[in-house]
A protein has these predicted regions:
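Structural alpha/beta surface segment adjacent to cysteine/selenocysteine redox centers
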Residues: 24-127, 132-133, 202, 222
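Basic/polar N-terminal segments that are highly enriched at the extreme N-terminus
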Residues: 1-6, 225
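C-terminal cap of thioredoxin/glutaredoxin-like
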Residues: 26-34, 121-225
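The canonical Cys-X-X-Cys-His
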Residues: 19-22, 181
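Aromatic-flanked redox-active Cys/Sec active sites in thiol-based oxidoreductases
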Residues: 13-19
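An acidic- and aromatic-residue-enriched active-site/binding cleft used to recognize and process polar
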Residues: 16, 49-51, 186
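Extreme N-terminal starter segment of soluble prokaryotic enzymes
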Residues: 6-12
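A generic fold-level signal
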Residues: 6, 95, 175-176
């Protein structure tokens, strides 16, 4: 089984909303797309790589708090922060938030893009518990491209969950990690332009050895070609 190749003008991105590395990667991708004047020619098609299922555990807050200071320095404009809400409200699951993005895809890939980034920032910047339905809907209400009533109905009846999970189960073995990009020409790359490692065991922290944001310009151009 191989990952599906998207059509020209589309970049498939396999990730989890709870992954800050994917959040940085998508931010850089959107920035490159805008800078190159290709907002109307290149779109992201979100695929799920559900980390809580892969790891059979929720993402620990300690991992989050180790990653955010490192990632935040690479894109200070995102205003990512350590978790600053009550510890009891830490979102132990991102399955519902990811489901919301896949439900929004039935409206448009553009709507899914907007909701995905809004939910990421609600988590990583605003410390909101995106495991909760009302929080997901409240975030969706800030997204101009999303039909919130249709999204709410889709989440109530679970219409997107089945197809999302089938796709995840079918392709998880081919995804190298979050984020994993697939281009229309078949090129694939995990966490573009970046090489990192972890120092220490429990309580360790990530070290970025290489980081080249310019690779996103090439990815966008290739997708549009």
């Amino acid at each position: 089984m191989t990952l599906p190749t998207p059509p020209v003008g589309t970049i498939a991105v396999w990730s989890d909303i709870g992954c800050p590395w994917a959040t940085l990667a998508l931010h850089r991708l959107y920035g490159a797309r805008a800078r190159l004047g290709l907002d109307d020619r290149v779109v992201v098609d979100h695929g799920l790589f559900l980390l809580e299922d892969v790891n059979e555990a929720p993402t620990r807050r300690s991992t989050h708090d180790a990653e955010i200071p490192v990632i935040g320095t690479r894109a200070p404009e995102l205003e990512l922060t350590l978790w600053h809400a009550d510890v009891s409200t830490w979102p132990v699951s991102t399955a519902l938030a990811n489901e919301a993005v896949h439900a929004a895809k039935s409206q448009s890939l553009s709507a899914a893009e907007q909701l995905d980034m809004a939910l990421r920032l609600a988590f990583f910047r605003d410390s909101r518990c995106i495991s909760l339905l009302h929080e997901v809907i409240t975030v969706a209400e800030t997204c101009s491209r999303v039909d919130v009533a249709a999204l709410s109905a889709a989440l109530d009846d679970g219409s997107a969950r089945g197809s999302m999970m089938r796709s995840y189960r079918m392709h998880a073995g081919e995804v190298q990690g979050s984020p994993h990009f697939v281009l229309p020409d078949g090129y694939e790359v995990h966490n573009p332009g970046m090489s990192l490692r972890w120092l220490g065991r429990a309580g360790g922290f990530p070290v970025i050895d290489e980081d080249d944001p310019s690779v996103y310009d090439d990815l966008v151009r290739r997708a549009a070609a």
